[in-house]
């Protein structure tokens, strides 16, 4: 494992090994310090609570030092485009930035959200891939325009921890939100669920389909792992007999770069596409999951997120353990 950009870079066996390693860290059965005397650069283009805190603490618990950098705030503004004429507001090119960090650090984590402006460009993850292009040390994706693999691995770990091994009936449901959001979390949750072999239902209103190429990969991974994928446009029946409910909002590709149009189209779905007690009652005693932060009584009711079915805090904690497993695998001496 030389880098960690998406779960699809790894095999099903690799993913299960990471989960098992993360469980050992959580249970206190792995006290190794593979980062002793070593530093990791963590580059954040965007705000963060769970990713930033869990990565910084995880590096420390593995014996290492985390160097926090925020381009445009605690470091220079960055240009990533090849051949760019840098006569505007960008001070340094990723080519130098990354290679200099590689002389100081043994790995670089990068968080760079979708700007929600140009779908065809952003779906290629240009900033993340420019880091990977120029780096001589491993790159860890801490959320990009298309993928959030660390979150997805914490999600898979949480499902295993709460429900045991084996194939589960998993629902990824779109939820109403006052503005369009990036697709990285739903993309990665769906992809990892398929790789593990779960029976995946994706529920969303018409017009909120995930990327077609990615869906092809999700279906292929599910077939190889013995799982299934079913996409539905009605919310209530989607909950029937489900064991895991994962709620997340995302924007429409049809209105990418035009948020006011997306907001108008999604308006009728307010309330109906919220996880509530009535929908959860249709499930097979399902656990409720969300990556956080979550808007209460918009995405999910207080009654659900505060219930014993909710595992969102455990899910957030597991970010720490699974990222330690990722770091240990990447950087084992």
Positions of predicted regions on the chain:
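Adenosine-phosphate binding glycine-rich loop
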Residues: 285-287, 291-333
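Phosphate-coordination loops involved in phosphoryl transfer and adenosine-cofactor binding
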Residues: 34-40, 167-169, 285
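A short, gly/pro- and small-residue-rich
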Residues: 120-141, 257-283, 308-309
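Phosphate/diphosphate ligand-binding glycine-rich loop within oxidoreductases
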Residues: 33-41, 48-160
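Rossmann-like adenosine-cofactor binding region
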Residues: 220-303
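Glycine-rich phosphate/diphosphate-binding loop of Rossmann-like nucleotide-binding domains
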Residues: 45-67, 160-247
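Positively charged, low-complexity intrinsically disordered leader regions
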Residues: 1-57, 72
